[in-house]
């Protein structure tokens, strides 16, 4: 199973419904990701990074394969 995503859980505590909508997901599903019960898809990971202004990153959400999915980040 995935690991707990504390930055995501902290963000979810203060996120508005509009901010949640920007992720293309629901608060309930994001909580499942936050508690490590679900893995964030590449699309949700990228949307979360944008919606949180970088508080939650794709690298945090997908530590095992982010460099394969987003090779441009590996060079940065």
Model region roles, listed by residue range:
Residues 1-22, 50, 56-68, 72, ...:
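A short, Lys/Arg-rich alpha-helix, primarily the initiator
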Residues 25-40:
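Recognition helix of helix-turn-helix/homeodomain-like DNA-binding domains
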Residues 37-43, 69-70:
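Short, solvent-exposed alpha-helical "recognition" segments
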Residues 34, 44, 52:
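DNA major-groove recognition helix of helix-turn-helix
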Residues 16-17, 42-45:
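Helix-turn-helix DNA-binding elements, focusing on the entry/boundary residues of the two helices
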């Amino acid at each position: 199973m995935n690991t707990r995503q504390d930055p995501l859980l902290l963000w979810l505590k203060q996120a508005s419904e509009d901010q949640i909508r920007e992720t293309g997901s629901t608060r309930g599903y994001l909580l499942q990701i936050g508690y490590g019960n679900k893995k964030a898809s590449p699309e949700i990971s990228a949307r979360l990074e944008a919606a949180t202004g970088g508080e939650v990153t794709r690298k945090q959400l997908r530590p095992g394969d982010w460099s394969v999915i987003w090779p441009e980040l590996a060079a940065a």
